[in-house]
């Protein structure tokens, strides 16, 4: 440092004073560091003493030292057998588990410090501390579900008889009352089980009482064991035509609930609960097609009827058109146009009522009589005219059957 002061021209006394101060500051830093380490060591020792005091007060430390001493003596004895060693290990584990449970019940000490101290001195093995493995929530729920899952039991004749008697007393549908009635005995059943059993034994009555239920189709094989011969089979409900009053109530229900057929069927003011929701929908579509289409549903289109005229020069778009004015598709137009180019259109009176349709048999007979002289003359000329005319007649008749339908 003095050489550096001489080189730069600094007073040696000042450099000496600076050097003493600099070395003293380093000594002070080292001293502070040693003091802090000493304080930390004393704090750790005090915490260990306090922890040992708490363990000693609870009795765990003495028992642990005693168990450890017994374990060392057992390990030092070379003549001891493996059975004695295992017994000693189990004894130590039982003692530790017992004291751990006692300490958890008391609220005087912190359990986390004790567990940390034990983990530092005792290896955590399955022999010393059995059953210490944590179980996940999913595994616990699976165990609970496995123990609480019910075993399905076959219905007996006594249970089925009690179910029938309960339906007579409380009525069909009051499954909770039937289940809780002390007069009837059921083997670990629920209200849903009673309902399912009734549906199995009486499928027709179930469909009548629950018209909107989507139940599976029952096969030919039935459970004969549970059904008694004394049961009275209810006659199936016959189909009834909708009356004008029902149509009016159906229209009012549509104005009130919209296209919600289930709500219309359950509305007590309308009185349509005897009808199914699908029946109400189909009836409304047929009776009120305009309102049905206005609601956004696809109504059934009008049937195509021929507009017949007696001339051959009319186009197909004029002869065959829908009542709503829509034209024929181009594909059908070209197919029929080719047939009309080969054969004339059937002669149908233009004033014939469309509701009566067309007498196809009479028209075919008349058409055949007109073709016979022409075919006979062509046959005499040596040509195959009869075969051609018969084929044309059959083709024209198929054309008539396809387009001239009622």
Swiss-Prot record:
- Biased composition annotated in UniProt, kind: Basic and acidic residues: 20-40
**The entry's DNA-binding region:** 175-202
What GO CC annotations are associated with the protein? Answer: chromosome, telomeric region; nucleus
- Pfam families for this protein: Myb_DNA-binding
MF terms from GO for this chain are: DNA binding
CDD domains according to UniProt: SANT_TRF
> Segment Disordered: which positions?
20-46, 368-389
- Domain of life of the organism encoding this protein: Eukaryota
Q: Which residues form the HTH myb-type domain?
A: 147-206
Q: What are the protein's UniProt keywords? A: Chromosome, DNA-binding, Nucleus, Telomere
Ranges where the Myb-like domain occurs: 234-288
Q: Which compartment or compartments is the protein found in? A: Nucleus; Chromosome, Telomere
Give the function comment from the record: Telomere-binding protein that mediates telomere clustering by promoting formation of head-to-head dimers of DNA molecules through the telomeric tracts. Binds specifically 5'-TTAGTCAGGG-3' repeats in subtelomeric regions.
Q: What is known of its domains?
A: The presence of both Myb domains is required for high affinity telomeric DNA-binding.
Name under which the protein is recorded: telomere-associated protein 1
Organism source for this protein? Answer: Yarrowia lipolytica (strain CLIB 122 / E 150) (Yeast)
List the top taxonomic levels of the source. Eukaryota, Fungi, Dikarya, Ascomycota, Saccharomycotina
Q: Which gene encodes it?
A: TAY1
């Amino acid at each position: 440092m003095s050489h550096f002061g001489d080189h730069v021209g600094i007073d040696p006394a000042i450099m000496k004073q600076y050097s003493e101060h600099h070395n003293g500051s380093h000594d002070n830093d080292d001293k502070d560091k040693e003091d802090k380490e000493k304080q930390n060591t004393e704090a750790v020792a005090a915490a260990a003493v306090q922890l040992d005091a708490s363990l000693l007060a609870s009795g765990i430390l003495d028992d642990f030292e005693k168990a450890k001493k017994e374990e060392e003596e057992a390990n030092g004895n070379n003549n001891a057998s493996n059975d004695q060693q295992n017994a000693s290990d189990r004894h130590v584990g039982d003692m530790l588990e017992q004291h751990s449970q006692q300490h958890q019940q008391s609220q005087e000490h912190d359990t986390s410090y004790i567990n940390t101290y034990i983990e530092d001195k005792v290896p955590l093995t399955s022999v010393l501390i059995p059953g210490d493995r944590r179980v996940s929530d999913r595994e616990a729920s699976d165990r609970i579900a496995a123990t609480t899952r019910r075993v399905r039991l076959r219905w007996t004749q006594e249970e089925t008889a009690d179910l029938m008697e309960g339906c007579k007393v409380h009525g069909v549908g009051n499954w909770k009352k039937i289940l809780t009635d002390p007069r009837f005995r059921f083997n670990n059943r629920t209200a849903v089980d009673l309902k399912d059993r009734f549906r199995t034994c009486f499928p027709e009555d179930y469909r009548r009482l629950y018209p909107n239920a989507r139940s599976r189709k029952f096969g030919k094989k039935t459970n004969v064991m549970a059904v008694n011969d004394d049961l009275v089979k209810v006659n199936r409900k016959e189909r009834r035509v909708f009356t004008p009053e029902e149509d009016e109530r159906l229209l009012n229900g549509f104005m009130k609930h919209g296209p919600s057929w289930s709500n219309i069927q359950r509305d007590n003011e309308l009185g349509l609960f005897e009808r199914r929701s699908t029946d109400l929908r189909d009836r409304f579509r047929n009776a009120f097609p305009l309102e049905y289409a206005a609601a956004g549903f696809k109504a059934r289109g009008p049937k195509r009827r021929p507009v017949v005229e007696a001339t051959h020069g009319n186009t197909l778009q004029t002869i065959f058109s829908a009542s709503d004015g829509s034209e024929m598709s181009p594909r059908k137009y070209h197919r029929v146009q080719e047939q009309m180019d080969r054969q004339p259109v059937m002669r149908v009176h233009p004033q014939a009522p469309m509701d009566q349709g067309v007498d196809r048999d009479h028209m075919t007979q008349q058409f055949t009589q007109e073709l016979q002289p022409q075919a006979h003359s062509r046959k005499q000329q040596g040509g195959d005219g009869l075969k051609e005319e018969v084929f044309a007649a059959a083709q024209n008749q198929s054309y008539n059957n396809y387009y001239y339908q009622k």
